[in-house]
Amino acid sequence: MVQMTSFCRQALKKAQDIQDADRSHIVVGLRQLFDYSTFSNIVAEFQHEYPNACVDVVPQDNRRPLEQLRSGQIDIGFFYGSEHNKDRDIAFTPLFALGYHVLMNPNSPLAERRALHLADLKGQSVVSSGSFDSFLSACQGPSLEQLAQVGVDCSKVSPSFEGALIMIQMGTAMSIVPCLANAVIPGMVKIPLLDYPPVMVEIAAMRHAPRLEVQSFIEIAKRRYGRYAHNSSLSSPQL
């Protein structure tokens, strides 16, 4: 009788959790140049599971992304594996790896190359997006010092990442970012950079008292992005 009562309580609590999740509101942070196509499918599947839930998608801060989680500004975020030291108050779940690519104008003399080494960028300009160090160091890319050592001009600065993309499209600068090998970026080409290993992309939420809807969103993301983890051609060049 005691076991049956305990089972009933657990069933009632689970039913209540599902009802609460369906009426919930979650905020998801998203990074620049992310895989928007797969992400939209994740949101669509989540909304199908919880049709009355509200999902807000906001840009993540490259300077202090972990603080957005801790302060409650976002419920779920995406991170590069090098952005944290396994902070115990946050639960990180690895999703897939992203290889580094050089973004450039299609008319650049390097645009026809199948892959590049950092030394190949000698004499080229690489634009910073205001928080340049933060954006690149977060994903283990080349530092300003490493770029300067091979003769890259790092003097061009844009106040926003969008402004940096415009400069790339104009052909006045390049940029180095992690992105999927099959990603299409309008108005520019991307060439794999061979000098750096892929960086791991993780999804994260606060570890304490995880809500059912947050857990469900993360499980959907793990399943959707699982195909990348088993297909290295999406994140690294095949030469």
Report each predicted region and the residues it spans.
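Alpha-helical "hinge/linker" immediately C-terminal to small N-terminal DNA-binding modules
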Residues: 1-17, 23
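Flexible hinge/capping segments at coil-to-helix
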Residues: 19-20, 90-100, 104-126, 211-215
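Central regulatory/effector-binding core of bacterial HTH transcription factors
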Residues: 23-84, 158
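Short loop->beta-strand "edge-of-pocket" segments that line small-molecule binding or catalytic clefts
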Residues: 29, 100, 116-137, 225
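Secondary-structure junction motif
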Residues: 37, 80, 124-148, 211-216, ...
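A late-sequence structural motif
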Residues: 38, 172, 190-233, 237
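Hydrophobic hinge/microswitch elements
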Residues: 61-74, 80, 131-189
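Beta-alpha-beta core module
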Residues: 86-93, 98, 159-209
